[in-house]
Curated annotation (Swiss-Prot):
It comes from Myxine glutinosa. Its main location: secreted. Residues 108-139 are annotated as: Disordered. GO terms for biological process: positive regulation of activated T cell proliferation; positive regulation of cell division; positive regulation of insulin receptor signaling pathway; positive regulation of MAPK cascade; positive regulation of transcription by RNA polymerase II; positive regulation of vascular endothelial cell proliferation; regulation of muscle cell differentiation. It comes from the Eukaryota. This is Insulin-like growth factor.
Amino acid sequence: YIRRVRQGSIYSLLVESQQWCKLTLTLLLLLALLTRCTLSETLCGSELVDTLQFVCDDRGFFFVPQHVPPRRGAHRRSRARKGIVEECCFKGCSLRLLEMYCARPSKAERDVARPRQRPHRASQHSRRGSQSRGRGRSR
């Protein structure tokens, strides 16, 4: 009888601990989802500058947006006048908003219509020509 009571209490402890583990795991997953779904984060000072440097890379950035999405009301107009500090430090900003403050690439970097010359191929063509000329002379 004593063994049955001990076994029963151990069993109930195991069941309770498994339930706690499931509950804890569920709460952790929910917390992870909620933090991942956060759309904006406040960034100030050097943290804001470092983030802009990372997002904008070689293009550089401005503290006032250079290109603003199409305006559809007062909310968009007020956003156009604000700088990045007001947006990101006081309210919080998203990656999309940060990208609005990046400088545009130079015209040469944007122009994909003009073909780029490849000197490597040109040197291969000149070698082929000299090889074929050389063969013709030796015959």
